[in-house]
Structure formats: C-alpha cells, structure tokens
C-alpha cells in the first residue's frame, strides 16, 4: 500500500483515524505548506493514519489549528466492477461500465485508470447487469498516447476471459 507523509489537524492525528479528501480549497493552494499537506493527497480518495510524528508547530492557514505530520496509507475504494473483471489480485482498466448504478465509483476513479482488485465483497445487479462489489486501489492514471487524430491508446484488460462465478 502506498504510504505518504502529510499534515492533519491535531484532532485527526491518531493512529487508525480514517478520512476522505473531498476537494482542495483554493486558499490551500497558495499556502507554503500545501506541498506537504493536501498537495500530497488525491481528492476523492480515503486515507488511514498509520503513524503520528512529532509536531513541528505548523498551523493551518484556514483553521488556525495546529497541524501534525502523519504517515497515511490510501484506503481501498469500494465500488462495482463487471463480474468478468472481478478477480482478487488482478489489475484491470476501469471502463465506467456501472455508470448510473448506486455504488459506482465514478466520483473517485476515472475511465481508463488501472485498478487492482484486492477483495471481493459480494454481488449486485443494476440495469440488468451483474456486478461484483469489490475493494480496489488505483494503480495508474489513464493512458493518453495518441494513435491517430480520433483515438487514444488503451492497454488491453488483463482480466481472465472465463472464471468461476462468485458464490
């Protein structure tokens, strides 16, 4: 799991604390601490504090609260993938097949991003299609190498062509 050092408020600086970054306020982008604070995190993703480091007295420009350095790891995303892509340990290209379904992770994963399935949690039917409810991590951004003026390159899915159905 990817770990990164960032800053959180003193109240959030507890091992095991989980939080989600929804967006980055404009005021943060001009702060001298941005590159070691929210600048290291991805909006839409969830994180878990795994280590608290000694405070160095930094203060938040917006809240004026004490900021504490912590080590966080990205928490897995829970969302829907087509059954043929849902196999633990497999890296697949997210194609947005579940758009419009409750539980579809469109707000945190972009079409074309590579995701690694870490756990299968169950099944769900939406729009007459079967999906697996899975935990996964984004492992790379979408590929944008131009093939010609109308197409972009996409790596083929490494999902197996056939597999046992989920129980």
Curated annotation (Swiss-Prot):
Superkingdom per UniProt: Archaea
Family: Belongs to the UPF0179 family.
InterPro entries in UniProt: UPF0179
Protein name: UPF0179 protein Pars_2336
């Amino acid at each position: 799991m990817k770990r990164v050092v960032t800053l959180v408020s003193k109240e959030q600086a507890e091992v095991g604390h989980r939080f989600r970054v929804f967006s980055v306020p404009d005021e943060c982008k001009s702060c001298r601490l941005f590159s070691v604070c929210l600048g290291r995190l991805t909006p839409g993703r969830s994180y878990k504090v795994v280590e608290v480091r000694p405070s160095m007295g930094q203060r938040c420009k917006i809240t004026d609260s004490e900021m504490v350095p912590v080590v966080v790891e990205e928490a897995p995303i829970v969302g829907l993938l087509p059954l043929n892509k849902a196999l633990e340990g497999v890296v697949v290209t997210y194609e947005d097949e579940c758009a419009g379904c409750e539980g579809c992770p469109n707000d945190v994963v972009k079409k074309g991003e590579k995701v690694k399935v870490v756990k299968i949690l169950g099944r769900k039917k939406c729009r007459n299609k079967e999906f697996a409810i899975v935990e996964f991590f984004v492992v790379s951004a979408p590929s944008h190498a131009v093939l010609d003026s109308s197409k972009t390159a996409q790596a083929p899915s490494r999902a197996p062509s056939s597999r046992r159905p989920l129980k």
